[in-house]
């Protein structure tokens, strides 16, 4: 709740702090279309869960930029959300390629996984948890982005590099938030 209080301070008359969220990603947003739904923004209610009760289509703009002249169908679809105030990039590549790419990068934050020992030894490394634990990634993501932004404001971080996350289940919501925070900047390393 600390980050929510800091982000909303002075903008809300009252803040009720009820503790940490179980998931940490905003709600799932869908649009009813015929007998099914179009997923506009993924969240803790996953496409797989929705598919158990109705047909599900993913919005064409789910993980792509929405044009300036296009009205967003859901909050969070158009603009960089929870993005650090420094450039951010998603790294798409093998462990070795990511380690090599980051080896000579200083003054940057790295969002990685518990198994990334070489990366975790860095001064500004932030772990999302075990690579396969998307629920942990969802729970930790916004706190990590807020911590990075605080350090960026102190001048300690000039850029952010995040490992590509698994996109299944709630991982789709994590990937969606990361890709938007990065302004759709993906560096392919392999």
Predicted regions located by residue number:
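Active-site-adjacent structural elements in enzyme catalytic cores
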Residues: 1-190
